[in-house]
Amino acid sequence: MSRNKQSASSGRWLKEHFDDKYVQEAQKRGYRSRAIFKIEEIQKKDKLLKPGMTVVDLGAAPGGWSQYAAEVVGDEGQVIACDILSMDSLPGVSFLQGDFREEAVLSALLERIQPDMVDVVLSDMAPNMSGNLASDQPRAMYLVELALEMCKQVLAPNGSFAVKVFQGEGFDQYLAEIRNMFKVVKIRKPDSSRDRSREVYIVATGYKL
């Protein structure tokens, strides 16, 4: 891509970003990102989060989902967040920076969780997209498979899982796998999710050990 095309594309993105009503509302309410409205809508419909719960948030930076989850679970609950990117501290959130695909990071994450089991696993993870669907989709599916593996390790019986998934190759098989593991599975496309995006959220409740 030429520099001029990149510049024009970046300019369009910035204009869209700052004109976005969800960006403006997030700033007004003191939230870190527009992504908060996705988990807020999921919460209103599916009631995943409750006071006193333990929540794991994967791909947490810049912290919108963790910020919202911490408000809901309150002082009696806890939110354990992990991301390869750095994240400023948040009240009620224990943050671990690192790639949980690495054994040392995974062990550190599990240490923060144990001996308790987790009530909810959240994942808003996505790879850096290149625009090449043939390479982007497998990388995205790899991340959601890792999130599901985390559920198998830490999720309590009847626990819940909400994960961002991009529709495409591997989606149907992944959905079938989740249906085998949970009693109730729904697909959500929050209003704040951009129409052109292939992202949807699989919301699963009633984890079956």
Curated annotation (Swiss-Prot):
Primary location class: cytoplasm
Subcellular location: Cytoplasm
EC top class, as a word: transferase
A single GO cellular-component term on record: cytoplasm
Cystine bridges: none
Catalytic activity: uridine(2552) in 23S rRNA + S-adenosyl-L-methionine = 2'-O-methyluridine(2552) in 23S rRNA + S-adenosyl-L-homocysteine + H(+)
UniProt keyword list: Cytoplasm, Methyltransferase, rRNA processing, S-adenosyl-L-methionine, Transferase
Molecular functions per Gene Ontology: rRNA (uridine-2'-O-)-methyltransferase activity
Binding site for S-adenosyl-L-methionine: 63, 65, 83, 99, 124
Superkingdom, taxonomy of origin: Bacteria
Known role: Specifically methylates the uridine in position 2552 of 23S rRNA at the 2'-O position of the ribose in the fully assembled 50S ribosomal subunit.
Family note: Belongs to the class I-like SAM-binding methyltransferase superfamily. RNA methyltransferase RlmE family.
Protein name (Swiss-Prot/TrEMBL): Ribosomal RNA large subunit methyltransferase E
